[in-house]
C-alpha cells in the first residue's frame, strides 16, 4: 500500500471505482454480449424463425449472471427484469444487431477498432459485477468465503456457466461444451478475481477495494483487447496453471499411470498364460487323435 500511495494513484483509483457504469458501459456490455450471440451457429436463422427465442437468448447473454446468482442465493431469478431501463437498452441492442437495415449497426460494432473499445468497456462492467457479487454474498453470509467466491465468479461469468441452457433455447444440445469442463479465459479470470475480492473483503489482502478494482480492470481490459485483436484463444494463466498442476497433481497422476501399467502387465501375463495353456491343450488333443488313429 505504501508503494501504491507513493505512485499517487489514490484519487485515480477512488474516482474509477465510483465511475457509474450505466448507461455507457452497460450498453457496451450488451453490444459485445449480443455480438457474440450472433457469432453462434444458427443464431441469425433463429432470429428470423423465432424472434422470441432469439430475444430470450439475448437476455440470457446480458443478464444470465444476475439470474444465476439470484437462484443460488434463493432470490427470484426474474428480479433483475424489474430494471426497465436496462431491459429496454438490451432489447434495443438485440434488435439493431439482428434486424438493422443493411446490417449497418452490426458492421459498425464489429469493425475492429470500435470492437476493441467496446471489449475494454465490457471488462469494466465485468469487474464491477464481481465486486458487487462479493459484497452481496457477504451481506447474506458474513463468513461464507466459499459462497462469496461462488457468487462473485457467477456474477463475472454467469452467461458462460449457463451456456448449455442458452443452447437449449436455440435448439442445440452440446454437453461436451460445458464451460466448467473447458473454461475460457473470462471464466477463469472471473474465478481468480472472485478469490482476490473475497480475500480483500475478509481483510486478508492488504489493498483497498478501489485499488483492486482499478488494477484488476486494467489487467482484464488489456488481456481481452490483446486477445481480441490477435484472435487468440489462449490463456495468460496457462504457465501458472501448468506449474501449479504439476506440483499439486503430478504425483497422483503418476501413481495412476503406474497403477494402469501394472494392470496392463497383469493382463498381458494372463493373456500369455491363457495362450500357453490353449497351446498345450491343442497339442495334447492332437496327440490323443494320433494315438486313437494308430489304434
From Swiss-Prot:
Cytoplasmic side: 40-51, 106-144, 200-201, 255-295
GO biological process, one term: regulation of release of sequestered calcium ion into cytosol
Composition bias, Basic and acidic residues: 267-286
Reaction catalysis annotation: K(+)(in) = K(+)(out)
Parts of the chain on the Lumenal side: 1-18, 73-84, 166-178, 223-233
Any GO molecular function: potassium channel activity
Membrane-protein topology: Multi-pass membrane protein
Binding site for Ca(2+): 74
Region (Disordered): 258-295
Pfam short name (any one): TRIC
Main localization, broad class: membrane
Protein residues bound to a 1,2-diacyl-sn-glycero-3-phospho-(1D-myo-inositol-4,5-bisphosphate): 122, 126
GO cellular component: nuclear membrane; sarcoplasmic reticulum membrane
Transmembrane domains' residue ranges: 19-39, 52-72, 85-105, 145-165, 179-199, 202-222, 234-254
Activity control summary: Channel activity is activated by a change of voltage within the sarcoplasmic reticulum lumen and blocked by luminal high Ca(2+) levels.
Location(s), subcellular: Sarcoplasmic reticulum membrane; Nucleus membrane
Keywords: Calcium, Ion channel, Ion transport, Membrane, Metal-binding, Nucleus, Potassium, Potassium channel, Potassium transport, Sarcoplasmic reticulum, Transmembrane, Transmembrane helix, Transport
Quaternary state and interactors: Homotrimer; conformation seems to be controled by binding to diacylglycerol (DAG).
UniProt record similarity statement: Belongs to the TMEM38 family.
Function: Intracellular monovalent cation channel required for maintenance of rapid intracellular calcium release. Acts as a potassium counter-ion channel that functions in synchronization with calcium release from intracellular stores. Opened by a change of voltage within the sarcoplasmic reticulum lumen.
The protein's name: Trimeric intracellular cation channel type A
Organism: Xenopus laevis (African clawed frog)
Lineage: Eukaryota, Metazoa, Chordata, Craniata, Vertebrata
Gene behind the chain: tmem38a
Amino acid at each position: 500500500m505504501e508503494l501504491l500511495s507513493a505512485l499517487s494513484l489514490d484519487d485515480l483509483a477512488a474516482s474509477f471505482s465510483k465511475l457509474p457504469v450505466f448507461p455507457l458501459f452497460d450498453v457496451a456490455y450488451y453490444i459485445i454480449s449480443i455480438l457474440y450471440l450472433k457469432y453462434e451457429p444458427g443464431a441469425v436463422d433463429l432470429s428470423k424463425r423465432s424472434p422470441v427465442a432469439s430475444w430470450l437468448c439475448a437476455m440470457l447473454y446480458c443478464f444470465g449472471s444476475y439470474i444465476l446468482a439470484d437462484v443460488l442465493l434463493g432470490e427470484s431469478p426474474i428480479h433483475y427484469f424489474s430494471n426497465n431501463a436496462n431491459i429496454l437498452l438490451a432489447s434495443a441492442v438485440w434488435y439493431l444487431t439482428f434486424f438493422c437495415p443493411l446490417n449497418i449497426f452490426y458492421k459498425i460494432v464489429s469493425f475492429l477498432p470500435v470492437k476493441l473499445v467496446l471489449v475494454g468497456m465490457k471488462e469494466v462492467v465485468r469487474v464491477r459485477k464481481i465486486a458487487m457479487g462479493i459484497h452481496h454474498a457477504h451481506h447474506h453470509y458474513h463468513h461464507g468465503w466459499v459462497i462469496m467466491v461462488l457468487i462473485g465468479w457467477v456474477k463475472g461469468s454467469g452467461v458462460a456457466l449457463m451456456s448449455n441452457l442458452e443452447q437449449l433455447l436455440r435448439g442445440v444440445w452440446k454437453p461436451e461444451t460445458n464451460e466448467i469442463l473447458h473454461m475460457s479465459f473470462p471464466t477463469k479470470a472471473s474465478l481468480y478475481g472472485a478469490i482476490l475480492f473475497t480475500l480483500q473483503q475478509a481483510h486478508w489482502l492488504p489493498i483497498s477495494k478501489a485499488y483492486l478494482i482499478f488494477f484488476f480492470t486494467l489487467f482484464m481490459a488489456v488481456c481481452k483487447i490483446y486477445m481480441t485483436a490477435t484472435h487468440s484463444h489462449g490463456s495468460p494463466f496457462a504457465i501458472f496453471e501448468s506449474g501449479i498442476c504439476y506440483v499439486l497433481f503430478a504425483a497422483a497422476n503418476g501413481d495412476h499411470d503406474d497403477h494402469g501399467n501394472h494392470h496392463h502387465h497383469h493382463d498381458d501375463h494372463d493373456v500369455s498364460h491363457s495362450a500357453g495353456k490353449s497351446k498345450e491343450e491343442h497339442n495334447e488333443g492332437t496327440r490323443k487323435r494320433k494315438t486313437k488313429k494308430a489304434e
